Amino acid sequence: MKNHETDTKTKHHMIESTGSGQKSLDEVNGTVEVPQNAGFWRTLMAYTGPGALIAVGYMDPGNWITSIAGGAQYKYTLLTVVLLSSLVAMLLQAMSARLGIVTGKDLAQLTREHTGKRTGFALWIITELAIMATDIAEIIGSAIALKLLFGFPLIVGIIITAMDVLVLLVLMKLGFRKIEAIVATLVAVILFVFLYEVILAQPHMGEVLKGYLPSSTVVTNHGMLYLSLGIVGATVMPHDLYLGSSISQTRSFDRKNRKSVAQAIKFTTIDSNIQLTLAFVVNSLLLILGAALFFGTNSDLGRFVDLFNALSDSQIVGAIASPMLSMLFALALLSSGQSSTITGTLAGQIIMEGFINLKMPLWAQRLITRLLSVTPVIIFAIIYHGNEAKIEDLLTFSQVFLSIALPFAMIPLVIFTSSKKLMGEFANRTWSKILGWIIAVILIILNIYLILNTLHIVQ
């Protein structure tokens, strides 16, 4: 990456926004007021919200099958992988938020400024494909949920899901807090649905807790290792790193004041960690549900429809089987898909503005972002006559794109947050810099392994 000269003055070893470019998510940037000289809890409430938008990326429909299959095949052993993945997510999202708060720019803007035109354009294409891949998984999840709940044909569900971009346009005019509240509500629905279903399943709590302890079999068992890689590889979503660096700037604070910046970093990180803990709980519940209900049944649980049907089949899940369990599962799937499409659309805008500085009306920008994602799904649905199995195969392919794009977001993030020139006194400390690079290298290796295995399975 080339050196980037800036003529803006620094204060308290921080860099102010460089140039006269547009702010990240300009229409909501700095719009949420933070009370001055307030107590801990009141200040925390002011900063609470962005973490929920980040957390939905860690419990989107693309993660569900892997988590439930992990429990169904290996009982509670892979809970330790869920825990480790969540800790990694917390570290990287804290870096992302700190980058946005200190520099006043998002990860996409900084990447564009610190690379040449060709490199920047290539990175934009890769990242745009990742956004499409993310949105594809969420659109498919929502469309299948609408079919399971209301009997809508898949093509109708896809179109309905695609149109929620219009709802987002209205919400943005009402204020960013409204978006945060809606996403938090959808996250709560997911949490309570799976908590209820796990309580009904009555897992052995001793075995559950033991599952969080590291086990050598995770590495020595090939099948277990592959599923572990699936959980870890799908945990850190590229678009969340861009999103986190942008929405951390929605709070209004004095960026020229060191104390205000430090406070923003502190409370944004607390909010992020709380919400990612909830995502950890949801992913744990998914795996626990798979273990408690499906371990030893030899059931085919590779698709959402299979899971939906299994929950109402007493021969598979026993006496607790009921249509209500299936409907609750579909409701949680719809909540996950809808909350994720909101954040995916926002991330798409951040990436389009940040990488290519595209100037167009917001409604057009969001519509283009959504059309780029929904078009492949509609084409697939038409070609395969709405066949759920084929549509879900597209979801699997979409995860490969996410794996490819991950290093192109993670490496710049670690570089930028480790830069004294960019971050001043808020740059990564030595231990976090080393840990960040170790995590980046490990995740890249894991994702390459996943890509090769996925392509081998497809062939």
UniProtKB/Swiss-Prot annotation:
GO biological process: iron ion transmembrane transport
Compartments in which it is found: Cell membrane
Recorded GO MF terms: cadmium ion transmembrane transporter activity; manganese ion transmembrane transporter activity; metal ion binding; symporter activity
Keyword annotations from UniProtKB, A to Z: Cell membrane, Ion transport, Membrane, Symport, Transmembrane, Transmembrane helix, Transport
InterPro entries per record: NRAMP_fam (IPR001046)
Segments forming a coiled coil: none
Membrane-topology annotation of the record: Multi-pass membrane protein
Protein known as: Divalent metal cation transporter MntH
